């Protein structure tokens, strides 16, 4: 699909950047000659806009070998960022998709500035080509034909091998993010814990990773009472899924991802209202993020050891379901008083984190659609983060800045720990109250990370989008897939 060339050839469409300061770039000047001065007229009349994310289409009318030019406005160079570029190109690829373009090229060097080099631009272009044109996988009987972009050429004077590598990495990041989106969008009667485990096993086998899938009996032997409690009401068996990627000769410096895999959440006996229950098929967004990251890792083979652990079940009501006031014993040996059965994700993660440590994780990053409180605090575009290790958090933060997946650190104070440890009957309680809800949930999980360096990522607000946007349709976003993978890639470079 991807090609790199130094000279522009015949294409259906060519994408060109327009900055405010460069309305007459060398390429535009040369092209203007072919257009007999008409491009300059369009610029002066503002028919070609330099405003951020403005897309202006110009038909060559046979004056060049290119059928149409798509000029992408990027605003002022001083405010040009990777986020601007991602949004602008995402919108551009959506436009090309709508026009059913099959052969497109991008004038890569026109997007290059002192801030962003050609490798950056190539990576982002290939990444958002997949993200921006992603379509929901539906179950409708009337399937519409989709015209795909079959050939995408980067025109640049830079080293072709380096640009090809950047295009490949970007493409893999975008594709794996879309894989996670598809998982999150799947209905709960299709994506059960068993089906999620089967998907994980297929992924592991494809990329020659080791894996384990613990069944209920094995969990009972290991004392995974927290995950098993959540599963009590279900007819679907629980799964504790582990993927093991060995990027080094020795099993050291192991990064452990733990993704919440609640395939449907009714709230249990702490029952959600109807409007709060619809959409809870997406409560396994953390698991999807972890699996998406492992897809990237499997493709790119970084020199880093990684474990991905997914505790998976649904949380439903029945005569056997766990109840408020129950006291359960986690794999760690810590006992938990259940005050809220709708705070089930942290229970599953408690055993997931303990299991990841048992498998050898030296660093822990958990990802979960955990609390509505984080949405109240940070909105729908920023992931909440908590940590017991600032050095690890800084590495996660740097990765998130590189991928434009915003995160913001929330605090853990001793008084927060006291609140989750406040129980007359057990070591911990799973829900101290609504105040500081996101912080309480993260603090609870931290009790199981203990002294292992740990970062918690609450993606309840960022895992799904209520409306279409430049990087995709409404629905699942694949939040944190690219950040997790980038973190591992950077670890591997050290």
From Swiss-Prot:
One of its GO terms (molecular function) is metalloaminopeptidase activity. Its EC number is 3.4.11.1, 3.4.11.10. Keywords: Aminopeptidase, Cytoplasm, Hydrolase, Manganese, Metal-binding, Protease. Its cofactor is Mn(2+). One of its GO terms (cellular component) is cytoplasm. NCBIfam families: PRK00913.1-2, PRK00913.1-4, PRK00913.3-5. PANTHER family: CYTOSOL AMINOPEPTIDASE, LEUCINE AMINOPEPTIDASE-RELATED. HAMAP family: Cytosol_peptidase_M17. This is Probable cytosol aminopeptidase. It comes from Bacillus anthracis.
């Amino acid at each position: 699909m991807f090609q790199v060339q130094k000279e522009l050839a015949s294409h259906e469409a060519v994408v060109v950047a327009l900055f405010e300061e460069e309305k007459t770039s060398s390429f535009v000047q040369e092209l203007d000659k072919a257009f007999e001065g008409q491009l300059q007229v369009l610029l002066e009349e503002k028919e070609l806009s330099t405003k951020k994310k403005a897309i202006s289409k110009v038909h060559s009318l046979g004056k060049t070998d290119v059928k149409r030019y798509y000029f992408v406005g990027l605003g002022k160079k001083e405010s040009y960022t990777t986020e601007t570029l991602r949004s602008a190109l995402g919108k551009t690829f959506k436009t090309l998709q709508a026009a059913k373009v099959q052969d497109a090229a991008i004038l890569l060097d026109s997007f290059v500035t002192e801030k962003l080099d050609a490798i950056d631009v190539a990576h982002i272009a290939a990444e958002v080509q997949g993200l921006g044109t992603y379509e929901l996988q539906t179950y409708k009987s009337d399937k519409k034909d989709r015209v795909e972009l079959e050939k995408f050429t980067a025109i640049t004077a830079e080293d072709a091998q380096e640009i090809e590598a950047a295009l490949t990495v970007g493409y893999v990041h975008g594709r794996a993010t879309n894989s996670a989106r598809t998982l999150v969008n799947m209905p709960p009667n299709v994506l059960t814990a068993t089906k999620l485990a089967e998907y994980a096993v297929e992924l592991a086998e494809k990329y020659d990773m080791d894996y384990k899938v613990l069944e209920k009996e094995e969990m009972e032997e290991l004392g995974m009472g927290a995950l098993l409690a959540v599963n009590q009401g279900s007819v679907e068996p629980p799964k504790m899924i582990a993927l093991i990627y060995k990027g080094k000769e020795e099993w050291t410096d192991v990064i452990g991802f733990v993704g919440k895999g609640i395939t449907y959440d009714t709230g249990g006996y702490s029952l959600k209202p109807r409007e709060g229950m619809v959409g809870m098929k997406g409560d396994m967004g953390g698991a999807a993020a972890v699996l998406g990251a492992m897809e990237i890792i499997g493709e790119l083979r970084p020199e880093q050891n990684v474990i991905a652990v997914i505790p998976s079940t649904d949380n439903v009501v029945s005569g056997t379901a766990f109840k408020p006031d129950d006291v359960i014993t986690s794999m760690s040996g810590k006992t938990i008083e259940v005050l809220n059965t709708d705070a089930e994700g942290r229970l599953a993660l408690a055993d997931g984190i303990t299991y990841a440590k048992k498998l050898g994780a030296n660093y822990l990053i958990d990802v979960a659609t955990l609390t509505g409180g984080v949405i109240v605090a940070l909105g729908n575009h920023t992931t909440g983060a908590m940590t017991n290790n600032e050095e690890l958090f800084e590495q996660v933060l740097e990765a998130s800045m590189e991928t434009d997946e915003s995160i913001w650190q929330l605090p853990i104070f001793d008084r927060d720990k006291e609140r989750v440890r406040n129980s007359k009957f057990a070591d911990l309680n799973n829900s101290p109250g609504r105040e500081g809800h996101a912080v309480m949930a993260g603090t609870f999980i931290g009790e199981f990370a203990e002294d292992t360096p740990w970062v918690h990522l609450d993606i309840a607000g960022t895992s799904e989008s209520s409306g279409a946007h430049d990087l995709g349709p409404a629905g699942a976003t694949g939040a944190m897939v690219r950040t997790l993978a980038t973190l591992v890639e950077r670890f591997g470079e050290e």
